[in-house]
Design a protein with these regions (language model features):
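Short secondary-structure boundary/capping segments
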Residues: 2, 55-58, 77-78
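Conserved beta-hairpin
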Residues: 62-81
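Conserved N-terminal entry element of GNAT/NAT acetyltransferase domains
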Residues: 1-19
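Conserved GNAT-fold acetyl-CoA-binding loop/helix
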Residues: 26-53
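Hydrophobic "lid"/C-terminal helical patch
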Residues: 21, 25
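A short helix-loop-beta-strand connector motif used in the catalytic cores of GNAT acetyltransferases and
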Residues: 49-66
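Conserved acetyl-CoA binding element of GNAT-fold acetyltransferases
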Residues: 82-90
């Protein structure tokens, strides 16, 4: 299910989207959010988005993610944990 909005594609993430999405999330976090976090908080966030268990949950459908694309570049992502908890929104 893909939806085009203003020339952008919004769809459920596929396995191939995981690494580019996490990279975009990390870069965005560092640019806009990290200033408000302690070094420990920054490390914890990085560990969260690079955790193999999180990726495994995504592959099993227990951690759902949508991506917004401008062509082939991921420019946004939103994920849901446990089917009802917004986990990441970038």
């Amino acid at each position: 299910m893909a939806d085009m909005a203003n020339g952008y594609e919004i769809r459920w993430a596929e396995d191939k989207d995981w690494i580019p999405a996490m990279h975009m999330i990390w870069k965005t976090f560092l640019k806009y959010e990290a200033v408000d976090y302690t070094e420990e908080g920054i490390r914890n966030f990085h560990e969260f988005i690079t955790d193999e268990h999180l990726y495994k949950s995504f592959r099993q459908g227990r951690y759902q993610m949508m991506v917004a694309l401008d062509g082939v570049r991921i420019i946004g992502a939103a994920s849901v944990r446990s089917y009802n908890h917004l986990s990441l929104l970038f």
